[in-house]
Amino acid sequence: LKKTPAVDIALHDPVDADAAHTSSESTSLKNEEIVGFDHIVPELRKKLTKGSQQLDVISIVGMGGQGKATLANKLFNDDSVKSRFDIRAQCCVSQEYSCRSILLAILRDLSCDDPAASELSTEDLRDKLQKMWKVKRYLILIDDIWEASVWEDLQPCFADVNNGSRIILTTRQVEVANSARISCEPFHLPMFKEDESWKLLKEKVFGNEGCSPDLEKVGLEIAKKCAGLPLSIVLVVGILAKGKNEQCWRQVAKNLGSHIQSDAEAMIEN
């Protein structure tokens, strides 16, 4: 797996952490925009737009809350990437997998919700897509594949007509990425280091303001408990920004445990 340092990833619009555990807030956290990846995007963009004319799969591997889907969508919507492909579509697999549902989602994304598509069988959907692949250079984003068997089931649906088509795939499982590999090595998203987590927390809480040494000491402890996950950092930014005092921060540090990571992952899964 290819690895790269985690640097300069910034979060926009920190959420109100007081309501972070409601379903509506969970949705907003799940969709929280994480921007940056400035050192990563150019390399992956090149894999999408340059190189062999053979169909290739660019797999992005990482834990829940690490920013896989955000990076994939950033690439998918990149102007230079969009201009390279004739047609584009995206879908999310999730744990309840259905080949027909995935193919239907892709076709609907390509055909502007053609109502007739819902009546097609799996075989008809596959055939309809195969006809598109033969005349169009395509880019497909498949988010959140959990098992290699799912990719093995989907793979025959994507024709290689040697026209530079690409598939972006996100997964938590190295096995899935290895199974999907054609030419490009799977890309392994790095975890934040503690100092990077603190840098991000400090930036989002204080902006251009300074941070006292006492708060920095507690802040480093909080950053450590975020376990290197951007989404975990989002969960605490709102609280820290509301109470910029040592007492409040120590209370957060005291109550913040390993559950923060499972909370972040649960929001990704729901």
Q: What is the meaning of each model-derived region?
A:
Residues L1-N270:
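Intracellular innate-immunity NLR/STAND receptor architecture
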